[in-house]
Amino acid sequence: MAIVRHKQPPLRRFMMYWVDHARQAFSSLGELWRNPLASLMTLAVLGVSLALPSCFHVLLKNAEVVEGSWQTSSQISLYLRKDLPEQSILDMKQRILLYPEVESVTYMSRDEALKEFREISGFGDALDYLDSNPLPPVLSVIPDPRWQNPEGAAELLNKLNNEDGVEQGKLDLQWLTRLQGIMNLLRHTITGIAVLLLSAVLLIVGNTLRLNILNQRSEIEVLKLVGATDAFIHRPFLYTGIWFGVIGGMLAWWLTEVMVIWSEGVVNELAGLYNSNFRLVGMGAVDGINLILLGALLGLIASWFSVHRHIRDIEPS
């Protein structure tokens, strides 16, 4: 007598597919807790390996904040002709403000310049003997953030020097160039270290799963004997790699925030010595979630290579 098989509706098959995935995912998580010591050792190494590049990322993010404040303070000073009328100077200020490369312009008159020089120089009494004010009026120009780099600032300086009434424009380009060079070196160094550490994560997860596969060799042979598909055999190990990455990423996020909190007092004290209100910035929710997703991706990649390499070599005898 023929056996009649009822074909399941597509929606039910779709739901069962994901239920099966969820079951194997949580089963893989349970496998970690069934070997607590080995799992904790692996997760600790993964957490530290992911925490180091994330700490470097936080360092770079804070360095870029400091760089931005330093670049903003590196303004272009335009020394104008002494005989230039006040109205002409104000017209020039408004004209320069219309430049797309300019963020703000501040005007300092000759009297204001002399008063400031008197306060900071310590030659107040000597200045009283001068017949006339030797200082010119000054326009202080802050470039737009997109132009706060050596090339952009130099181009803007040349443009401003062509303004009628400008005797000389000054900008410390050498200082800007050095600052940009230091930041580029920091970015390249951190990128190189991060690549090495993330490669270590791949090796750690891959080697851990290789040992798991060898420990479960007999079970894999039985599954192959009864006709289990490769996808069914691979799936628990793939989920194990993902769990390693996710939990390692969460641990790395926590370690990074601990480092930020631990360093906060020292950084605030240093900023106070320079009369700065700078405050250390942590990872934040977006960076933390990205770190967890990165850990999951690295775990999946490492487990995929390890599973396809080692399970393929296991055949029932």
UniProtKB/Swiss-Prot annotation:
Gene Ontology biological process terms, A to Z: cell division
Keywords in alphabetical order: Cell cycle, Cell division, Cell inner membrane, Cell membrane, Membrane, Transmembrane, Transmembrane helix
Disulphide linkage map: none
Entry annotated with the keyword Magnesium: no
InterPro entries reported for this sequence: ABC3_permease_C, FtsX, FtsX_ECD, FtsX_proteobact
Membrane-related topology note: Multi-pass membrane protein
Periplasmic topological domain: 61-188, 263-280
Compartments reported by the entry: Cell inner membrane
One annotated Gene Ontology cellular component of this protein: cell division site
Entry's transmembrane regions: 40-60, 189-209, 242-262, 281-301
Topological domain ranges for the Cytoplasmic compartment: 1-39, 210-241, 302-317
Subunit-level organization: Forms a membrane-associated complex with FtsE.
Role played: Part of the ABC transporter FtsEX involved in cellular division. Encoded in an operon consisting of genes ftsY, ftsE and ftsX.
UniProt family annotation: Belongs to the ABC-4 integral membrane protein family. FtsX subfamily.
Name listed for the protein in its UniProt record: Cell division protein FtsX
Gene designation per UniProt: ftsX
